[in-house]
Amino acid sequence: MRKNILFITSCLLAATTFAEDINTLPKDTTKVIDIEEVVVIASPKETGKLRELPTAVSLLSQKDMQANQITTLKNVSSLVPNFFMPDYGSRLTSAIYIRGIGSRINTPAVGLYVDNIPYIDKSAFDFNFYDIERIDILRGPQGTLYGRNTMGGLIKVHTRSPFSYQGTDVKLSYGTKSNYRSASLTHYHRWSDCFAFSAGGYYEGSDGFFRNSLNGKKVDNMEAGGGRIHAIWLPSENLKLDFTIGYDYNDEGGYPYYYTGAIDGYDKENEKYKNYIGKISYDQDCTYRRGLFNTGLNIEYQAQKFILSAVTGFQNLNDRMFMDQDFLPVSIYTIEQKQRLNTISEEITFKSKNNKRWQWVTGVSGFYQWLHTTGPVNFMEDGVTDMIEGNINNTFKKIHLDDPRRTPEMSLDVLNNRIRVSGSFDTPVFSTAPF
């Protein structure tokens, strides 16, 4: 019995001594912190951090875009406050509104930069986001640094850098409602410590939602495809050359519009096309085709006390819009608009380095844009008979009835069953400004 008590007492003393030894061990001072992936994106014009700017900013990462199915700028309206881009018509309809400020025609009131290259014309704003790394949306005027077209705000789109990510991305999507399908493949390769590149392409298609009640065909079908090459070369420690080139092509219906009836002031009871009110029933195919080519070179030189950036961009847009302007099963008139747009831009920026107490930025920017537009209106058989002959002859008849003694009976007969009213416009634009 005494032996058992002695053995138990010895075990307890040993356990107490071991516990004291553990407690006297020095604590580990190494902290382990789990952080998410960090992406560093530099801008030629900002000298500080984006979150420190005195303006309202929304940032969308690639994860945010994937989680919310953000494939174009039109989808951003569901996430960013005070941002609205109407999702109707074709990709030609690309008006953007921030805080209610926007422009439906002519030059936009919201600027767009893709990899620090400005997109001057809003006809090019709607494109696919298959290889986008991040989107920055700055709400409020940004004209001090970015000049014209930024009264409402600014959108900056950044593609993924092949230096920060290597691998191959494959994306496939399919939807049953409109038979929507999309596929994209992009390869990112770091050749060495001085050179990296990425190359990829995408396809997107949809059968549409709206049917033409006249022939049963869907009128908002869409096919699109394109590709982009991005290359970065570091010839020295303080020199960087960033080159991008890309092309997008889309062919779509895009105009599921319908006739709404006679406007106020007309005889609505005797409406001639009453059976077609509220129905998509035009007899001509409404289509929009666009080819968009973009290329740019960003040269950055880091001196001891400042950073010099020179960004050169070129854009070519060639499109064709054909629309049945009467939206009826009769042949009244159509319009065919073609745009041929070329834009070359240059921005040279000097700015201080971020480790300096006094932060400054200055530079000069400019662009030249030449736009050739043709927009002929074609009056068809019913348009010649009803709109031209009918209206003129009704006017002649009214004049004769008002004063039959002094005015003879007159009438007009148009021999051609179709009349083409041509329209051709050249719109060159040049702009330059220091900042």
List PLM regions with ranges:
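N-terminal periplasmic "start-of-domain" segments of outer-membrane beta-barrel proteins
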Residues: I22, V32-M65, S94-A95
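Non-catalytic regulatory/gating segments with a bias toward low-complexity or hydrophobic composition
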Residues: V57, M65, V76-S77, I135-G140, ...
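Extracytoplasmic beta-strand/coil segments of soluble accessory domains associated
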Residues: K74-I117
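Outer-membrane beta-barrel translocator/receptor signature
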Residues: S94, P108, D121, Y130-E133, ...
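Short acidic/polar hinge/loop motifs at secondary-structure boundaries
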Residues: D115-P141
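Short sequence motifs at beta-strands and strand-loop junctions characteristic
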Residues: G147, G175-N179, V219-E223, Y276-K279, ...
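Periplasmic-side early beta-strands and strand-to-turn transitions of outer-membrane beta-barrels
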Residues: S164-Y165, S173, R190-Q284, L317-S331
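Face-selective signature of the C-terminal outer-membrane beta-barrel domain
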Residues: K240-G246, R290-N318, I335-F435
